[in-house]
Amino acid sequence: MLYQRLAYYNMQWYAGSPHLRCLNVGKPDRPTYLPLEVCQLVPLQRYKKSLSTMQRSKLVEGSRQKPLDRKLSLSRALRDNNYDSEPMLRECGISIAREFMQVEGRVLQAPQLSAARDRELYTPNGRWNFNKDRFIQPIKVKTWGAVNFSARCNVRDLVKRLIQAGIMKGIQMEDCAADVIEEMHQMKWETPAKRVEDVFQQIKSSFKQQKPGFLLCVLPEKNSDIYGLWKRKCLAEHGIVTQCVVPPANIKDQYLTNVLLKINAKLGGLNSLLKNETTRAIPLVSKAQTIIFGMDVSHGSPGSNVPSVAAVVSSLGWPLISKYRASVRTQAPRKEIIDYLFKQVGDDDQGLIKESLIDFLNNSKGQPPEQIIIFRDGVSEGQFNMVLTDELTKITEACKFFGSKHFGGKWFPKFTVIIAQKNHHTRFFLPNERNRNEVNNVQPGTVVDKGICHPRNYDFYMCAHAGMIGTTRPTHYHVLHDDIGFSPDDLQELVHNLSYVYQRSTTAISIVAPIYYAHHAAAQVAKFTRLDDMSETSSSHASQAEPAPVPELPRLHPDVASSMFFC
């Protein structure tokens, strides 16, 4: 970017450098350019914005420790700090042991997974693959196309290989070589909005009157500015399921399988099922119609005034617990408690819970759920009471309102509320004589519910996944409310099962799938709109007496609203 030299800079700074690039210190839509030679970078500033994918990767890589290394460093810290010599602790009668606390735990048996033709997927160490198996419910993709925003990818070759890999997994994809749309070279220097709009004009011309059922989108890089605008165009404006990819230079079969896992789930298929789903052997859940909610709130970076995004994910098709849908809303910045679970407007409810219940009825022959299980992420212990008095109350009101509209006020479901926490410092280490696995982490399926848990309330720790790098961090589950009446064993089995139904992966995950899906749904829909612009709008109202209105996100098109678009 060139800058115009003023007389001041001619006299005070380098007169022979008019072509140096400038530093943009303004907003994306209001740039402010400063000459580089007059700027200084102040050291030791805290960076508050989101890190890039590469930065996050380097941060995690630099901070991870293998279990034995972490255990040794903790032992060394206890010894070197000599907490027992602290006068205040001694005065209070508090002593800190230098040895790790021994606690009892048990390892749950991994649930059985089924692929096509009732073949069992082998799950050693919480991992499996589809090398010789097909997806249990593969989809047919008839009308679809591919869009290329990247100059480095041979999209036609990618499409050909994807179709071949799909055949191996049971997915029937028609050849769309004629419907590969390349971005015109001259558009690469335009704004992301113009680039997306131009490509969609080509799509309309290519498909004439028939809307494609699926679009594969090849992006030039991760975290591309095109991503959010493309998703909004497809999901909100046109109702087209889409999968964005940034293919590596050397595309391997496993990469294609991972892409197909997402495509199949987004288009309504299922990759695998728990055997006890189909045999109705999940304790309590398989005995009565049950809906499972996953709820999460995504916030902007610290210090920003960006609206928070709340997502509610709910299960479809009882007795299955593997298929979900999502609803998303914005709310006040940094607010953790979800606002729009129940929102009565006149004689109607426009809240998140109603949308979930309607889709559940449509997939259960009009029968309402008798049991509602709620998994909530992202709240601290100081907010537990607010979850019960605010969120559970709103969900109860939404169900009561829904029951009065559809079932004559004679529907009274039972509720169970469970909080999942990952942001804690508890770690488990195997005793030395039992360090037999490759990285010395606890085995997947490890549960601890004694010794370090609350003396009165019901909580437990679970390591459902296999920690292959670094030290496994368990998820801490707190049961705040339980009308259904789960026994500890039954609830732990349900949580363990829900760690194996994450359709976009072939590994057990560290937290139940509904919560992971809620996180993905909030993050993806938030990118529909430039939230930086929302932040500026909110800031412009900050000095006014009345609070700034929270901008709403675009609603999903009806054709994709019930899909697993977030997968």
Residue ranges and their predicted role:
Residues 1-567:
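Long, low-complexity, intrinsically disordered terminal regions
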